Design a protein with these regions (language model features):
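Catalytic-core region of carbohydrate-active enzymes that cleave or remodel glycosidic bonds
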Residues: 2-62, 85, 93
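Catalytic cores of secreted or luminal carbohydrate-active enzymes
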Residues: 47-140
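Composition- and surface-driven signal marking solvent-exposed, interaction-prone regions
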Residues: 1-6, 41, 137, 191-195
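C-terminal beta-sandwich/jelly-roll accessory domains of carbohydrate-active enzymes
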Residues: 122, 128-206
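Short, contiguous acidic/charged loop-to-helix segments that flank catalytic cores in large enzymes
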Residues: 2-3, 77, 81, 153-157
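Flexible loop/turn segments at secondary-structure boundaries
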Residues: 33-38, 70-74, 130-132, 186-188
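Hydrophobic, well-ordered secondary-structure elements that form the walls
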Residues: 15, 90, 178
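Short, flexible loop/turn elements at secondary-structure junctions
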Residues: 30-33, 67, 127, 171
Length: 206
């Protein structure tokens, strides 16, 4: 799935054709964190990326993130216990996008762009109408330099005036790429003010 997000629209197109329901809304959940081959592996991260990209290829579709709905002890639990919030988040998509209840927020922060400022990476996001929740430490960020080796950020802070996240690592004096929760198992802690999580992302294409 690393390079084949088109698999998803082909599947949905077939289902819609078989059911004869036109562009029936297709809302789905991002696969949850799980240590398929160890915590530092990235295979599942590429699948999540393909899921996210599939939204732009499938008309009338949307995805929820689940990367904050697992506990550290669930590292080898492929079906995490917290099912209620998964259902709630899917219902938010339906209520907002299908039934037009726009007062119900259905999207968490999504990566928009980033800029290098010296040794710091300044990252901006879409869907920040309610800002970023400051009740959590911002963990899960990594930064890489020209050697393409990613290091955990040792300093992450929120520039609240612009809602940008500023990331740096002492091991990376000149950042060229940023990743967030781009591992098989990494629990997300960056939550929007609407209590919805940030979609895992990477800025590189290596």
């Amino acid at each position: 799935m690393k390079h084949t997000p088109s698999v998803w629209p082909n599947m949905v197109q077939l289902w819609r054709k078989e059911w004869g329901l036109g562009e029936l809304p297709f809302y789905f959940a991002e696969i949850a964190p799980y240590a398929y081959g160890g915590t530092q592996q990235e295979k599942a991260a590429y699948l999540r990326e393909a899921q996210f990209r599939a939204q732009s290829l499938i008309p009338n579709s949307a995805m929820i993130s689940t990367n904050d709905l697992v506990e550290p002890y669930e590292i080898y639990n492929i079906h995490p216990r917290n099912k209620t919030k998964v259902g709630q988040r899917l219902s938010y998509l339906a209520l907002n996008l299908t039934y037009g209840l726009k007062q119900i927020h259905c999207f968490g922060p999504q990566y928009k762009s980033w800029t290098a400022k010296g040794s710091e990476a300044w990252v901006s996001f879409d869907h920040l109408e309610m800002g970023i929740c400051r009740n959590y430490d911002l963990r899960g960020f990594e930064v890489a330099g020209e050697d393409r080796v990613f290091h955990p950020a040792d300093k992450v802070w929120l520039h609240w005036q612009t809602n940008e996240v500023v990331i740096s690592s002492e091991k990376v004096p000149n950042p060229v790429a940023v990743r967030y929760c781009f591992r098989d198992f990494q629990v997300g802690t960056m939550i929007g003010g609407n209590e919805l999580p940030t979609i895992p992302f990477r800025t590189d294409n290596w």
